[in-house]
Swiss-Prot record:
Biological process according to GO: mannitol catabolic process
Keyword Oxidoreductase belongs to the record: yes
Native organism: Oceanobacillus iheyensis (strain DSM 14371 / CIP 107618 / JCM 11309 / KCTC 3954 / HTE831)
Keyword terms of this UniProt record: NAD, Oxidoreductase
UniProt GO molecular function: mannitol-1-phosphate 5-dehydrogenase activity
GO cellular component terms listed in the entry, alphabetical order: cytosol
Binding site for NAD(+): A4, V5, H6, F7, G8, A9, G10, N11, I12, G13, R14, G15
HAMAP family per the UniProt record, alphabetical: Mannitol_dehydrog
EC id: 1.1.1.17
Enzyme class name: oxidoreductase
Name used for this protein in its record: Mannitol-1-phosphate 5-dehydrogenase
Length: 386
């Protein structure tokens, strides 16, 4: 039986990547720092995944073990030495942390097992595997870099599946939406293509990453930030508000124009894709908390992320002003959550310098740019019309 090493035993790791690895015939070793989850994995050796829908289909995942990377670093190294594939679902900020363990494992692997290995970062970001590779290679001696490039692939991936916040009777069980997408860049794979059910291998990943980021993530941000501003608790509740409905269709029309111009997507097919995405947010069987989806506003207001980049692309390709994307950016600037470190930091910036300067600082936009002016205009409208 093939072995997969997966970093991140959270809901996404178990409910999305772990499920597909099992369905592909892998035994999976979950690596995490959460001792309770790792203990339960080793105790139960299986868990259930439920598809959020009327029938709540139940799927069982077997052949799993867990390693606490803090308590058993040598076991992590040994697992990487013997692995057939390595995947991650830890969050973008944790990739530099796990890179040290992966680097150590790969260095030991070159001594014991001279076979190729692919490491696929399944993160909500552009270029996750490439970033992970940079951090893995940081600790290498110069003469080892060529060998690592020859043996180890870091193909970038685009992943998409809504896994809401949840509390289940069994700690390991997880509910996910039925829809998923996992696209991997084929040209960066070393050796044989990993035979994983559900992966679509493509030659050029960029269009798929940006289509997902600027449709799914952009779209999800709208009921999250506007929903919070308007007093809603869940995405499903927020999606019933006509003001939010109007904004999401408008914003995804703007980001869609940018994507069609940039990558030549078929207009009719892209509109069908947008409609499917909006229907996912309206799924009554997934109750996702608006504040969970909205967390990390500084990262999400970044120059290359889901709100600012499609807005700038829209301006560049059409010469028009992205009203609905600007409105969403404004709502993100208003987001306040005492349990979110980035939200606290953002509000401190705003208190110190004002909304305009804070936006300029986190987005990289000029203070007199078209987008900045429109964002501040929309922000004032939101403040006055709540």
């Amino acid at each position: 039986m093939k072995t997969a090493v997966h970093f991140g035993a959270g809901n996404i790791g178990r409910g999305f990547i772990g499920l597909l690895l099992y369905q592909s015939g892998y035994q999976t070793i979950f690596i995490d720092v959460n001792n309770q989850v790792i203990d339960e994995i080793n105790k139960q050796k299986s868990y259930h995944v439920y598809l959020a829908g009327k029938e709540k289909q139940e799927l069982t995942v077997n052949h799993i073990t867990g390693i606490n990377s803090i308590k058993e670093p040598d076991a992590v190294t040994e697992a990487i030495v013997k692995a057939d594939v390595v995947t991650t679902a830890v969050g973008p900020t944790i990739l530099p942390v796990i890179a040290k363990a992966i680097s150590k494992g790969l260095q030991e692997r070159t001594k014991q097992n001279n076979s190729p290995l692919n490491i696929i970062a399944c993160e909500n970001m552009v270029g996750g595997s490439s970033l992970l590779k940079e951090h893995v290679f940081e600790s290498l001696e110069a003469h080892k870099i060529g060998e690592f490039d020859r043996l180890y692939g870091f193909p970038d991936a685009a992943v998409d599946r809504i896994v809401p916040n949840q509390t289940n009777k069994n700690l390991l069980d997880v509910m996910v939406e039925p829809y998923y997408e996992w696209v991997v860049e084929k040209k960066k794979i070393v050796g044989e293509v990993p035979p994983i059910f559900g992966i679509t291998y493509v030659d050029d990943l960029a269009p798929y990453i940006e289509r997902k980021l600027f449709t799914v993530n952009t779209g999800h941000a709208i009921p999250a930030y506007l929903g919070t501003h308007l007093g809603y608790d869940t995405i499903v509740e927020a999606m019933k508000d006509l003001r939010i409905d109007d904004t999401i269709y408008g914003a995804l029309a703007e980001s869609g124009e940018a994507l069609i111009h940039a990558y030549g997507f078929n207009r009719e097919m892209h509109q069908e894709y947008v409609s499917k995405i909006i229907q996912r947010f309206q799924n009554p069987y997934i109750s996702d908390d608006v504040k969970r989806v909205a967390r990390g506003p500084i990262r999400k207001l970044g120059a290359k992320d889901r709100l600012v980049k499609p807005a700038l692309m829209y301006i560049e390709y059409t010469g028009k002003i992205p009203v609905y994307l600007a409105k969403t950016i404004a709502a993100a600037l208003l987001f306040n959550n005492d349990e979110d470190r980035e939200a606290i930091e953002l509000q401190k910036k705003i208190s110190a310098t004002g909304y305009q300067q804070a936006f300029v600082e986190v987005s990289g936009c000029d203070s007199d740019s078209i987008l900045t002016k429109k964002v501040i205009e929309q922000l004032r409208l939101l403040q006055n019309k709540k």
